Curated annotation (Swiss-Prot):
GO biological process: maintenance of cell number; single fertilization; sperm axoneme assembly; sperm flagellum assembly; sperm mitochondrial sheath assembly; spermatid development; spermatogenesis
Keywords: Cell projection, Cilium, Coiled coil, Differentiation, Flagellum, Leucine-rich repeat, Phosphoprotein, Repeat, Spermatogenesis
Function: Required for normal spermatogenesis and male fertility. Plays an important role in sperm flagellum biogenesis.
UniProt cross-references to PROSITE patterns, sorted A to Z: LRR (PS51450)
Protein name per its UniProtKB record: Leucine-rich repeat-containing protein 46
Source lineage: Eukaryota, Metazoa, Chordata, Craniata, Vertebrata
GO CC annotations on file: sperm flagellum; sperm midpiece
Keyword flag Repeat: yes
Coiled coil residues, start to end: 203-228
Transmembrane region(s): none
Null allele phenotype: Male mice show reduced total sperm counts, impaired sperm motility, and are completely infertile. Sperm exhibit a variety of abnormal head shapes, as well as coiled, short, or absent flagella.
Cell compartment(s), UniProt: Cell projection, Cilium, Flagellum
Chain positions found as Phosphothreonine: 178
InterPro entries: Cilia_flagella_integrity (IPR050576), Leu-rich_rpt (IPR001611), LRR_dom_sf (IPR032675)
Amino acid sequence: MPGDEQEAKKAAQRTEEGVHITEALITKRNLTFPGDEDLSEKMFHTLGELETVRLDGEGITCIGNLEKLRNIHSLYLQSNKIQRIENLACITSLRFLSLARNQIRHVENLLDLQYLQFLDLSENLIETLKLDELPESLLILNLCGNPCTNQEGYRKMVIGALPLLLDLDKQPILERWTSDEEDKSSDDDDEFPELNGPFCAERGFFKDLEQELHQHQERRQQAALTEHLSRMETQPVLTDLPLLPAVPMAGDCSSTATDQPGKESAPKATSSTQTASTTKKQVSKNQKSSVQARKGALAATTSKTSQAATPSMTKMTNKKSTK
Protein backbone atom coordinates (compact mmCIF):
# COMPACT_ATOMS: atom_id res chain seq x y z
CA MET A 1 0.00 0.00 0.00
CA PRO A 2 1.17 3.51 -0.78
CA GLY A 3 0.84 4.61 2.86
CA ASP A 4 2.93 1.74 4.14
CA GLU A 5 5.63 2.43 1.55
CA GLN A 6 5.88 6.06 2.62
CA GLU A 7 6.20 5.10 6.28
CA ALA A 8 8.93 2.61 5.41
CA LYS A 9 10.81 5.28 3.44
CA LYS A 10 10.56 7.71 6.35
CA ALA A 11 11.81 5.06 8.76
CA ALA A 12 14.74 4.28 6.47
CA GLN A 13 15.49 7.98 6.14
CA ARG A 14 15.46 8.38 9.94
CA THR A 15 17.81 5.44 10.24
CA GLU A 16 20.24 6.98 7.75
CA GLU A 17 20.04 10.41 9.35
CA GLY A 18 20.33 8.99 12.85
CA VAL A 19 18.71 9.99 16.12
CA HIS A 20 18.98 13.66 17.04
CA ILE A 21 18.54 15.42 20.33
CA THR A 22 15.14 17.09 20.50
CA GLU A 23 13.28 19.16 23.06
CA ALA A 24 10.78 16.35 23.39
CA LEU A 25 13.53 13.88 24.25
CA ILE A 26 15.09 16.25 26.77
CA THR A 27 11.73 16.84 28.37
CA LYS A 28 10.90 13.15 28.43
CA ARG A 29 14.13 12.22 30.19
CA ASN A 30 14.49 15.19 32.50
CA LEU A 31 11.12 16.87 33.04
CA THR A 32 8.46 14.18 32.75
CA PHE A 33 6.80 12.87 35.90
CA PRO A 34 4.66 9.76 35.21
CA GLY A 35 1.10 10.03 36.49
CA ASP A 36 1.21 13.78 36.85
CA GLU A 37 0.60 15.34 33.45
CA ASP A 38 -0.27 18.75 34.90
CA LEU A 39 3.10 18.95 36.60
CA SER A 40 4.84 17.92 33.38
CA GLU A 41 3.12 20.74 31.52
CA LYS A 42 4.09 23.23 34.21
CA MET A 43 7.70 22.08 34.07
CA PHE A 44 7.96 22.23 30.30
CA HIS A 45 8.66 25.97 30.26
CA THR A 46 11.55 25.45 32.70
CA LEU A 47 13.67 23.74 30.06
CA GLY A 48 16.06 26.69 30.13
CA GLU A 49 16.51 26.31 33.88
CA LEU A 50 17.83 22.76 33.70
CA GLU A 51 21.33 22.38 35.13
CA THR A 52 21.80 18.63 34.63
CA VAL A 53 20.62 16.83 31.48
CA ARG A 54 20.78 13.05 31.05
CA LEU A 55 20.45 11.62 27.56
CA ASP A 56 22.51 8.45 27.89
CA GLY A 57 21.56 5.22 26.13
CA GLU A 58 19.14 6.84 23.66
CA GLY A 59 20.90 5.76 20.45
CA ILE A 60 21.73 9.39 19.64
CA THR A 61 23.97 9.81 16.61
CA CYS A 62 24.29 13.61 16.44
CA ILE A 63 24.66 16.36 19.02
CA GLY A 64 22.39 19.37 18.50
CA ASN A 65 19.35 21.38 19.59
CA LEU A 66 20.92 22.41 22.90
CA GLU A 67 20.45 26.16 22.50
CA LYS A 68 17.70 26.41 25.12
CA LEU A 69 19.81 24.79 27.83
CA ARG A 70 21.24 28.12 28.96
CA ASN A 71 22.06 27.12 32.55
CA ILE A 72 23.27 23.59 32.00
CA HIS A 73 26.31 22.46 34.02
CA SER A 74 26.35 18.70 33.42
CA LEU A 75 25.54 16.78 30.23
CA TYR A 76 25.42 12.97 30.07
CA LEU A 77 25.64 11.55 26.54
CA GLN A 78 27.39 8.24 27.20
CA SER A 79 26.37 4.93 25.62
CA ASN A 80 25.06 6.44 22.38
CA LYS A 81 26.22 6.31 18.75
CA ILE A 82 27.70 9.77 18.48
CA GLN A 83 30.49 10.08 15.91
CA ARG A 84 31.45 13.75 16.21
CA ILE A 85 31.80 16.31 18.97
CA GLU A 86 29.83 19.31 17.71
CA ASN A 87 27.23 21.99 18.44
CA LEU A 88 28.34 22.54 22.04
CA ALA A 89 29.46 26.18 21.74
CA CYS A 90 25.97 27.35 22.73
CA ILE A 91 26.30 25.90 26.27
CA THR A 92 29.40 27.73 27.49
CA SER A 93 28.46 27.16 31.15
CA LEU A 94 29.10 23.41 30.78
CA ARG A 95 31.47 21.93 33.36
CA PHE A 96 30.82 18.20 33.12
CA LEU A 97 30.58 16.30 29.82
CA SER A 98 30.37 12.54 29.45
CA LEU A 99 30.75 11.10 25.94
CA ALA A 100 31.96 7.66 26.98
CA ARG A 101 31.17 4.57 24.89
CA ASN A 102 30.37 6.32 21.63
CA GLN A 103 31.98 6.21 18.17
CA ILE A 104 34.04 9.40 18.33
CA ARG A 105 37.28 9.43 16.32
CA HIS A 106 38.57 12.96 16.89
CA VAL A 107 38.72 15.45 19.74
CA GLU A 108 37.32 18.72 18.38
CA ASN A 109 35.01 21.69 18.95
CA LEU A 110 35.67 21.93 22.70
CA LEU A 111 37.64 25.17 22.99
CA ASP A 112 34.51 27.27 23.45
CA LEU A 113 33.80 25.43 26.69
CA GLN A 114 36.04 27.61 28.84
CA TYR A 115 34.60 26.29 32.11
CA LEU A 116 34.75 22.60 31.26
CA GLN A 117 36.43 20.72 34.09
CA PHE A 118 35.39 17.07 33.63
CA LEU A 119 35.58 15.31 30.28
CA ASP A 120 34.96 11.60 29.80
CA LEU A 121 35.85 10.27 26.35
CA SER A 122 36.62 6.72 27.41
CA GLU A 123 35.81 3.73 25.18
CA ASN A 124 35.80 5.61 21.87
CA LEU A 125 37.84 5.30 18.66
CA ILE A 126 40.33 8.16 19.08
CA GLU A 127 43.64 7.21 17.47
CA THR A 128 45.33 10.61 17.27
CA LEU A 129 44.89 13.05 20.13
CA LYS A 130 45.03 16.75 19.24
CA LEU A 131 46.07 18.37 22.49
CA ASP A 132 45.37 21.88 21.24
CA GLU A 133 41.68 20.95 20.97
CA LEU A 134 41.37 20.37 24.71
CA PRO A 135 40.38 23.34 26.93
CA GLU A 136 43.04 24.22 29.51
CA SER A 137 40.38 24.46 32.22
CA LEU A 138 40.16 20.66 32.47
CA LEU A 139 40.72 19.15 35.91
CA ILE A 140 39.87 15.54 35.08
CA LEU A 141 40.20 13.79 31.72
CA ASN A 142 39.41 10.17 30.92
CA LEU A 143 40.59 8.66 27.63
CA CYS A 144 40.79 5.03 28.73
CA GLY A 145 40.01 2.52 26.00
CA ASN A 146 41.18 4.73 23.12
CA PRO A 147 44.07 3.74 20.83
CA CYS A 148 45.78 7.10 21.46
CA THR A 149 46.64 6.07 25.02
CA ASN A 150 49.13 3.54 23.65
CA GLN A 151 51.24 6.27 22.09
CA GLU A 152 54.73 6.61 23.57
CA GLY A 153 54.95 9.51 26.00
CA TYR A 154 51.18 9.99 25.89
CA ARG A 155 50.68 10.72 29.58
CA LYS A 156 53.58 13.15 29.80
CA MET A 157 52.37 15.08 26.76
CA VAL A 158 48.81 15.39 28.04
CA ILE A 159 49.94 16.57 31.48
CA GLY A 160 52.23 19.13 29.88
CA ALA A 161 49.43 20.51 27.71
CA LEU A 162 46.88 20.86 30.53
CA PRO A 163 48.33 22.88 33.43
CA LEU A 164 45.33 22.42 35.75
CA LEU A 165 44.82 18.70 35.20
CA LEU A 166 44.64 16.70 38.43
CA ASP A 167 43.55 13.29 37.18
CA LEU A 168 44.24 11.53 33.87
CA ASP A 169 42.64 8.19 32.99
CA LYS A 170 41.59 7.56 36.61
CA GLN A 171 45.18 8.07 37.76
CA PRO A 172 45.89 11.13 39.94
CA ILE A 173 48.74 13.42 38.96
CA LEU A 174 50.51 13.25 42.31
CA GLU A 175 52.86 16.17 41.80
CA ARG A 176 49.88 18.52 41.45
CA TRP A 177 48.01 17.43 44.55
CA THR A 178 48.75 19.18 47.84
CA SER A 179 50.53 16.54 49.92
CA ASP A 180 49.48 17.38 53.47
CA GLU A 181 50.58 14.78 56.07
CA GLU A 182 49.33 12.25 53.56
CA ASP A 183 46.71 12.16 54.83
CA LYS A 184 43.83 13.31 55.54
CA SER A 185 43.08 12.36 51.94
CA SER A 186 39.72 11.06 53.09
CA ASP A 187 38.73 14.70 53.60
CA ASP A 188 38.89 15.19 49.84
CA ASP A 189 36.61 12.22 49.28
CA ASP A 190 34.09 13.64 51.73
CA GLU A 191 34.16 17.15 50.31
CA PHE A 192 34.34 16.15 46.64
CA PRO A 193 32.56 12.82 46.09
CA GLU A 194 32.35 13.72 42.40
CA LEU A 195 36.02 12.81 42.03
CA ASN A 196 35.36 9.12 42.72
CA GLY A 197 33.80 6.43 40.56
CA PRO A 198 33.18 6.36 36.82
CA PHE A 199 32.19 9.57 35.16
CA CYS A 200 29.11 8.03 33.60
CA ALA A 201 27.41 7.58 36.99
CA GLU A 202 24.82 10.07 38.08
CA ARG A 203 26.32 12.71 40.34
CA GLY A 204 23.68 15.41 40.57
CA PHE A 205 24.43 19.08 40.52
CA PHE A 206 28.09 20.16 40.35
CA LYS A 207 29.00 23.28 42.23
CA ASP A 208 31.93 25.43 41.30
CA LEU A 209 34.53 22.81 42.16
CA GLU A 210 37.48 24.91 41.15
CA GLN A 211 36.55 27.45 43.80
CA GLU A 212 35.91 24.68 46.29
CA LEU A 213 39.35 23.19 45.64
CA HIS A 214 40.94 26.58 46.15
CA GLN A 215 39.05 27.17 49.40
CA HIS A 216 39.97 23.69 50.60
CA GLN A 217 43.66 24.40 50.01
CA GLU A 218 43.37 27.73 51.82
CA ARG A 219 41.76 26.03 54.81
CA ARG A 220 44.60 23.56 55.01
CA GLN A 221 47.22 26.31 54.82
CA GLN A 222 45.39 28.34 57.49
CA ALA A 223 45.18 25.32 59.78
CA ALA A 224 48.91 24.69 59.39
CA LEU A 225 49.69 28.35 60.11
CA THR A 226 47.45 28.37 63.19
CA GLU A 227 49.11 25.25 64.54
CA HIS A 228 52.55 26.75 63.94
CA LEU A 229 51.65 30.00 65.74
CA SER A 230 50.16 28.13 68.69
CA ARG A 231 53.37 26.16 69.06
CA MET A 232 55.43 29.34 68.92
CA GLU A 233 53.31 31.00 71.62
CA THR A 234 53.39 28.03 74.00
CA GLN A 235 55.55 28.81 77.07
CA PRO A 236 57.66 26.05 78.63
CA VAL A 237 56.17 24.68 81.86
CA LEU A 238 58.53 24.80 84.85
CA THR A 239 58.09 21.82 87.12
CA ASP A 240 58.68 22.29 90.86
CA LEU A 241 61.28 19.69 91.76
CA PRO A 242 62.05 18.82 95.45
CA LEU A 243 65.25 20.36 96.76
CA LEU A 244 68.15 18.02 97.45
CA PRO A 245 69.13 17.78 101.15
CA ALA A 246 72.13 19.97 101.84
CA VAL A 247 75.19 18.56 103.61
CA PRO A 248 75.98 21.06 106.39
CA MET A 249 79.49 21.81 107.55
CA ALA A 250 80.61 20.99 111.06
CA GLY A 251 79.08 23.43 113.48
CA ASP A 252 76.17 24.40 111.16
CA CYS A 253 73.75 21.74 112.41
CA SER A 254 71.98 23.90 114.92
CA SER A 255 71.50 26.86 112.58
CA THR A 256 70.20 24.68 109.78
CA ALA A 257 67.75 22.95 112.04
CA THR A 258 66.34 26.23 113.35
CA ASP A 259 65.94 27.93 109.91
CA GLN A 260 63.06 25.75 108.68
CA PRO A 261 60.68 24.55 111.39
CA GLY A 262 58.03 21.89 111.08
CA LYS A 263 58.27 19.07 108.59
CA GLU A 264 61.52 20.19 107.02
CA SER A 265 63.36 20.07 110.39
CA ALA A 266 63.18 16.28 110.49
CA PRO A 267 65.41 15.61 107.47
CA LYS A 268 67.76 18.37 108.61
CA ALA A 269 67.99 16.78 112.08
CA THR A 270 68.70 13.44 110.49
CA SER A 271 71.49 14.90 108.42
CA SER A 272 72.87 16.64 111.55
CA THR A 273 72.84 13.35 113.43
CA GLN A 274 74.66 11.65 110.57
CA THR A 275 77.23 14.44 110.54
CA ALA A 276 77.69 14.23 114.31
CA SER A 277 78.16 10.48 114.19
CA THR A 278 80.70 10.89 111.42
CA THR A 279 82.57 13.49 113.49
CA LYS A 280 82.56 11.19 116.53
CA LYS A 281 84.00 8.36 114.49
CA GLN A 282 86.76 10.61 113.23
CA VAL A 283 87.51 11.84 116.79
CA SER A 284 87.62 8.30 118.13
CA LYS A 285 89.98 7.32 115.36
CA ASN A 286 92.19 10.32 116.16
CA GLN A 287 92.17 9.43 119.88
CA LYS A 288 93.16 5.87 119.11
CA SER A 289 95.99 7.02 116.92
CA SER A 290 97.21 9.49 119.59
CA VAL A 291 97.14 6.76 122.27
CA GLN A 292 99.10 4.48 120.00
CA ALA A 293 101.55 7.28 119.36
CA ARG A 294 102.01 7.85 123.12
CA LYS A 295 102.55 4.16 123.71
CA GLY A 296 105.13 4.11 120.98
CA ALA A 297 106.89 7.11 122.51
CA LEU A 298 106.95 5.52 125.98
CA ALA A 299 108.30 2.31 124.55
CA ALA A 300 111.04 4.20 122.80
CA THR A 301 111.90 6.12 125.98
CA THR A 302 112.00 2.94 128.03
CA SER A 303 114.31 1.27 125.58
CA LYS A 304 116.65 4.25 125.62
CA THR A 305 116.62 4.33 129.43
CA SER A 306 117.38 0.67 129.62
CA GLN A 307 120.19 1.08 127.14
CA ALA A 308 121.64 3.96 129.11
CA ALA A 309 121.37 2.13 132.39
CA THR A 310 123.17 -0.96 131.16
CA PRO A 311 126.71 0.53 131.00
CA SER A 312 126.27 2.18 134.42
CA MET A 313 125.45 -1.15 135.94
CA THR A 314 128.51 -2.61 134.31
CA LYS A 315 130.64 0.13 135.81
CA MET A 316 129.25 -0.53 139.28
CA THR A 317 129.99 -4.20 138.95
CA ASN A 318 133.55 -3.49 137.93
CA LYS A 319 134.04 -1.18 140.86
CA LYS A 320 132.82 -3.78 143.30
CA SER A 321 135.06 -6.40 141.88
CA THR A 322 138.04 -4.12 142.16
CA LYS A 323 137.38 -3.56 145.71
